[in-house]
Regions:
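N-terminal basic/disordered segments at the start of proteins
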Residues: 1-25
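Short glycine-aspartate micro-motif
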Residues: 3-7, 128-132, 195
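Conserved beta-strand core positions
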Residues: 4, 13, 74-75, 129, ...
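A generic beta-sheet turn/junction motif
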Residues: 8-10, 123, 135
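Conserved Rossmann-like nucleotide-cofactor binding loop
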Residues: 11-13, 136, 203
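Helical "lid/coupling" subdomains associated with nucleotide-phosphate turnover
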Residues: 17-20, 40-71, 79-121, 125-127, ...
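Conserved ATP-binding subdomain of kinase catalytic cores across diverse folds
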Residues: 22-36, 67
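Acidic, divalent-metal-coordinating active-site segment for phosphoryl/phosphodiester hydrolysis
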Residues: 136-142
Length: 291
């Protein structure tokens, strides 16, 4: 059986088509488009016309792909952008009207749960932290002996934090202090455990450090993360693509996107970081294919 999972984030819209093979999920096709749905969401918490229109166009193209690939079983989910937007229901109705696709808005708990499920596929440890850095929110979970025991979802994503603090123009002192304060509230971050990292910004970090896209399960030290953060931050946004191999669509959100990770590493005092190439989509696909 083939299954598709569509994941609408604040920055990107993604779709994966999967099947189960030898007890594991196998990805058959992947689509990704940068839509920046949360662009301009701002203080009024209203989705703006242009981001909604470009996101709808991608949904329409994904519906066509599902038809061409003969995929009848699919699930579409959304995260922080639609959790936060006051006009989210209007957009959801619009997508349903034009594409027939129903969107389920995940709460922070389930987003953290599915991210942790994806992280387990990349980890060789049973106890660890997971941080999933998205465009609108950041999910942090604590896994002990394979079970999620604590989680948090905070609106600290790379797009909204770039809009809020603009660290590449105004300096990173304010955003770093803000991240430290936000993580201080999470008293359960109190052990030195490995940190598994997920999300689009994380992929760019992995490529900039390792030099290739074969990063799933690869381990690096926290010092390498701190060093690369400093290099990226000190490099002008237009030059980051050529110098570090970063996707041009993410060059402007890298500073804000990496601040939650550096804050978490400093709080835990743990020196090991493990990259995960999967995410919420794979966590959901695994659950549905097991049913």
């Amino acid at each position: 059986m083939k299954l598709a999972v569509i994941d609408l984030g604040s920055n990107s819209l993604r779709m994966g088509i999967y099947e189960k093979e030898n007890g594991k999920i196998k990805e058959l096709k992947r689509e990704r488009h940068q839509v920046r749905l949360a662009e301009g969401l701002g203080a009024d918490n209203m989705l703006k016309k242009e981001p909604m229109e470009r996101t709808l166009k991608v949904f329409e193209s994904y519906r066509q792909v599902l038809i061409e690939e003969n995929v009848d079983n699919f699930k579409a989910i959304a995260t922080e952008s639609l959790r936060r937007a006051e006009n989210a229901s209007e957009f959801i109705k619009c997508v349903k009207l034009f594409t027939g696709i129903d969107i389920d808005v995940l709460d922070g708990e389930n987003e953290a749960k599915y991210g942790a499920a994806a992280a387990k596929m990349s980890m060789d440890a049973d106890s660890f932290y997971v941080i999933d850095i998205g465009g609108g929110s950041v999910e942090i979970a604590k896994v002990k002996e394979g079970v999620v025991v604590n989680y948090s979802s905070k609106p600290l994503g790379c797009v909204v934090m770039t809009e809020k603090f603009n660290p590449d123009e105004k300096g990173d002192g304010e955003i770093k202090a803000y991240m430290k304060q936000e993580l201080e509230e999470l008293e359960w971050i109190n052990e030195s455990l490995p940190v598994c990292v997920l999300g689009g910004v994380v992929k760019e970090l992995a490529v900039s450090i390792l030099g290739n896209y074969d990063f799933d399960g690869k381990k690096i030290t926290a010092d390498k993360v701190f060093d690369m953060y400093d290099k990226i931050y000190k490099t002008k946004v237009p030059e980051r693509c050529e110098k570090f191999g970063i996707d041009p669509r993410r060059c402007d959100v890298m500073t804000a996107g990496l601040c939650p990770l550096t804050a978490l590493l400093k709080k835990t005092g743990m020196g090991q970081v493990v990259f995960c190439a999967r995410g919420v989509r794979e966590g959901i696909a695994m659950e549905l294919l097991d049913e």
